[in-house]
Each structure stands twice: as structure tokens, then as C-alpha cells.
Amino acid sequence: KQDEKFFGHYSLFGDDSLDKNLKKFGFVKEDITDVFLTHLHFDHCGGAIEWNDDQSGYRPTFKNAQFWTNENHWKWATEPNPREKASFLKENILPMQESGQLNFLPTPTTGNYGFAPDLKMDVIFVDGHTEKQMLPVLQYQEKTIVFAADLIPTAGHIPQVYVMGYDT
């Protein structure tokens, strides 16, 4: 959907693809029923939308899926501030709504939102990397897994405990 210059800066390396990776596990794109969008920056939601067959417009990549975000973040993405405007590309966002596949999670003023209790999944809403980013919290095999996305993109972004010591 973007031009050659864009992909000169932001493109995948190698011959891996979504279709190949889904096939490895016995799935195709039509099997996907839900897409949880941590936030709507192009590098997190761009793959959710693709060209239609004659490249005259766009369509959801996952035609049988519901797309999940929250209304506060949607408003932030569709009416962006100057700093984030380049990260919210309308061609990656608006087709979700136009297709009728977009859903908004309620945004609680305190605490988490129980998104899928049967999957043991909650959602934490944070302001930091972007307004009302959603972090999925999963309970799995007696462990808690939080996908922090760009809020904490690498282990290097977590401050280390440091106790100063020296000899006198």
C-alpha cells in the first residue's frame, strides 16, 4: 500500500510471509477470527489491510475477523497530533471501520478490562507510547504474560536495579 521510498525504510527482510507462517501451523488467513490491535501505528496494524484484487481500494486481510481497539485510541489515530501523524496511516485504519469489522473495547477509568475471560485474557490501557495503547495480559500455565508492545519494546528499556558500592 505504501510507496517504494517507504518500504526502503520499513520492510521485512528475507522471504518470510504471513501466509507461509500461518501455513506452517495449519492455518490460512480465512481462519483468523479476531485481531487484537495494541495500537494503530502503521507498524502494528499495517498488515491488517491489503489491496483489493484490482488495486483500486483496500480490504481487510482477514475477511472473517473482528478487529479490536478502543474508542479513545481510535479518535487519537483518526485525528492525530502533529508528532504522531506520520505513524497513523488512514489506509491502514479506515478500511477496518468501513468493512464493519471494527469493534471498540470499553475503556475503564481504573483497573483492567476482562476481554476474554474464557481465554484468561485481560487488557491494561496505558498512555505513554501512544494514547490508550492496549496491553493484553494472559494467564497461561500458572504464569502471567503481558505483551507490552512498544511501551517496553526491548529488555534494554527496563531499568536495572543498581546498588552503588565502592571501597574507601
Which residues are covered by each model-predicted region?
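Cap/insert and terminal regions of metallo-dependent hydrolase folds
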Residues: H9-K20, Q133, V137-T168
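Conserved P-loop NTPase mechanochemical-coupling segment
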Residues: Q2-H9
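Metallo-beta-lactamase
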Residues: Y10-F27, D31-D43, T61-F125
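Residue-level marker for buried hydrophobic side chains located in beta-strands
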Residues: F36, F67, I145-F147
